[in-house]
Swiss-Prot record:
GO molecular function: DNA binding; DNA-binding transcription factor activity
The protein's name in its UniProt record: Transcription factor FapR
The gene coding this protein: fapR
Keyword vocabulary terms for this entry: DNA-binding, Fatty acid biosynthesis, Fatty acid metabolism, Lipid biosynthesis, Lipid metabolism, Repressor, Transcription, Transcription regulation
Family membership noted in the UniProt record: Belongs to the FapR family.
The keyword Signal belongs to this UniProt entry's keyword annotation: no
Keyword Lipid biosynthesis: yes
Species of the source: Listeria welshimeri serovar 6b (strain ATCC 35897 / DSM 20650 / CCUG 15529 / CIP 8149 / NCTC 11857 / SLCC 5334 / V8)
Biological process (GO), any one: negative regulation of fatty acid biosynthetic process
Function: Transcriptional factor involved in regulation of membrane lipid biosynthesis by repressing genes involved in fatty acid and phospholipid metabolism.
High-level lineage: Bacteria, Bacillati, Bacillota, Bacilli, Bacillales
Length: 189
């Protein structure tokens, strides 16, 4: 691991965050071979907000007007990327209120809600409803983990007002949920 001077590290840190505003302090610390505290001090010195604030900023600037099928504040998780009728990505941080108290495992309806609301959000119509969902929970998710849900819209096979959206949710690189959502939507006039 190459050691950088403070000035070089801060310049590279700024570039890394500009390229990926969703990178964590822990990932940055590993990338630059320094402590998380050093990264936090560098961020403060550069006036770069913490991850949660960066995510909120990106989502509010880019996606508040893009989502038509439901208000942005009704989306479970935070949308970090969306291309209507194509794909979308959201993140959801599992906190104490989302888990069973006795074993700290996330309640399944939170994972489902994130995936379902993402499947709804990617539909470009004002009315989008789930008509059928097939969901498989691959592994349990624990308190403190971050779920990244990725939705992909399948190409339409006919003129029906049904669109199929596949959603896969991950913790890191590990698949935790896989779902197929059939979405009814009012056709655009």
């Amino acid at each position: 691991m190459k050691k950088y001077s403070k000035k070089d590290r801060q310049m590279k840190l700024q570039v890394a965050i500009e390229e990926n505003p969703f990178i964590t302090d822990e990932q940055l610390a590993e990338k630059f071979g320094v402590s998380v505290q050093t990264i936090r001090l560098d961020r403060v010195a550069l006036s770069i907000p913490e991850l949660r604030e960066r995510i909120k900023h990106v989502a509010s600037v880019n996606y508040a007007d893009a989502v038509k099928s439901l208000p942005i504040d009704e989306v479970i998780g935070e949308i970090i990327d969306i291309q209507l009728s194509k794909s979308a990505i959201s993140i959801f941080d599992v906190r104490s209120e989302h888990v069973f108290k006795r074993n700290k495992i996330a309640r399944g309806h939170h994972l489902f809600a994130q995936a379902n609301s993402l499947a709804t959000a990617v539909i470009p119509n004002e009315l989008a409803l789930t008509t059928q969902a097939t969901v498989r929970f691959v592994r349990s998710v624990n308190e403190g983990e971050r779920i990244i849900a990725k939705a992909k819209v399948r190409p339409a096979t006919d003129n029906r007002a049904i669109t199929i959206v596949d959603v896969k949710s991950y913790v890191g690189d590990e698949l935790v949920l896989k779902g197929k959502f059939e979405m009814y939507h009012a056709t655009q006039k």
